[in-house]
């Protein structure tokens, strides 16, 4: 006999969560999904303390710091589409009754957490990205480890993305300069810079003057063709164009 976990006090049945055994299909919303990834100031500080204290002598399998990235950049991440036929964003799914019902039913069938009798919009998101793939973060700890291993003092990140490398570098107190064309990220990057430090430039990295930037290591995660389609970034017309006009010039410039 399965012993079910209690529903947390913060979840109200048929308000922000639904019961698997008797689901209501008009309850879960996109805004709930965004809200569930937000941290209180106290929890934000706890996550940052974990990031600072995480030992970086070995490249451990850890997602420390990811909750901070979800807190700040989740909404823009959810707007990013993948180059998959009929790909829908989670906002499009939860805003469409037919699609929402389809994925709620599938999440119930998948039943990833048997002991949990309820579903939230996060469960629908996790189910969808498990099936369709998802846009993911560069783990902050990976940057922390690389900087420790190579004894870096200043990081250049010409394709800054969601902020994982900023967190990794700043958790060691290192200088960090990130570059990105996605101006939609600026509002929440400004909040991150205020808390953790670092510098962000919103421009095409191929047009940046790297000679004016202090760095002794480059750690970045450039887009690969059009697999992930970001705001304010034109699509590459071909694989040849991607290498010839973007990746190779970027590597040479670094």
Regions found by a protein language model. Give the residues of each.
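Class I S-adenosyl-L-methionine-dependent methyltransferase catalytic core
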Residues: 1-67, 79-254
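Intrinsic structural disorder/low-complexity segments
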Residues: 74-76
């Amino acid at each position: 006999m399965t012993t079910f976990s209690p529903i947390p006090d913060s979840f109200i049945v048929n308000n922000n969560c639904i019961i698997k055994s008797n689901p209501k299909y008009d309850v879960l919303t996109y805004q709930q999904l965004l809200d569930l990834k937000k941290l209180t100031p106290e929890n934000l500080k706890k996550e940052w303390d974990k990031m600072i204290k995480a030992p970086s002598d070995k490249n451990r399998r850890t997602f420390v710091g990811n909750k901070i990235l979800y807190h700040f950049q989740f909404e823009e991440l959810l707007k990013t589409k993948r180059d998959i036929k009929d790909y829908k964003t989670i906002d499009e799914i939860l805003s469409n009754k037919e699609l929402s019902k389809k994925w709620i039913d599938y999440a119930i069938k998948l039943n990833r957490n048997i002991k949990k009798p309820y579903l939230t919009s996060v469960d629908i998101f996790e189910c969808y990205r498990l099936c369709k793939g998802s846009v993911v973060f560069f783990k902050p700890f990976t940057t922390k480890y690389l900087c420790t291993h190579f004894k870096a003092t200043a990081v250049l990140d010409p394709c800054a993305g969601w902020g994982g490398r900023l967190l990794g570098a700043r958790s060691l107190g290192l200088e960090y300069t990130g570059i990105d064309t996605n101006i939609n990220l600026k509002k929440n990057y400004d909040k991150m810079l205020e808390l953790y430090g670092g510098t962000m430039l919103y421009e095409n990295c191929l047009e940046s003057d790297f000679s004016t930037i202090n760095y002794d290591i480059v750690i970045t995660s450039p887009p690969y063709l059009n697999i992930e389609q970001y705001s304010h970034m034109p699509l590459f017309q071909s694989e040849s164009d991607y290498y010839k006009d973007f990746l190779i010039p970027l590597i040479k410039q670094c």
